[in-house]
């Protein structure tokens, strides 16, 4: 597959799965042995774990809209720079919801093999938006 093909797989996953919350076709995008990478650790969560992740995020932000700002490819890897808007409706990592819209940016790094996402990691810039909403209090 080409870099362009790999970008399309990630873009379609964002449009068809993450932005809608409809996980019925997630198997078309995510491999059986799908791995999430966080804090330098690898977690093989498979399709079931990916479904739980998507539904969990959409519970917190039910109107989530992820917009791709740019994508870069290198071999099997796709880097996606994105922005997100969504209403903060449920508690998240111990933070109380505000019921207000929030906007933040982030970067995802996905590895594609045999036409499916096999590995995912990334980082989201949530500190400033959460401070602006009073969810995270900055020390004076």
For each of these PLM feature ranges, what is it?
Residues 1-140:
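C-terminal and inter-domain tail/linker signature
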């Amino acid at each position: 597959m080409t870099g362009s093909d790999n970008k399309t797989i990630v873009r379609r996953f964002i449009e068809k799965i993450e932005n809608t919350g409809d996980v019925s076709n997630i198997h078309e995008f995510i491999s059986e042995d799908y791995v999430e990478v966080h804090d330098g650790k690898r977690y093989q969560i498979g399709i079931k774990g990916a479904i739980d992740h998507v539904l969990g995020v959409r519970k917190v932000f039910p109107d989530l809209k992820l917009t791709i700002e740019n994508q870069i490819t290198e071999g099997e890897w796709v880097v996606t720079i994105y922005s997100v808007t969504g209403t903060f409706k449920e508690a998240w990592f111990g933070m109380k919801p505000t019921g207000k819209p929030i906007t933040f940016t982030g970067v995802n790094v996905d590895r594609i093999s045999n036409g499916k996402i096999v590995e995912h990691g990334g980082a989201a810039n949530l500190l400033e938006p959460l401070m602006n909403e009073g969810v995270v209090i900055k020390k004076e």
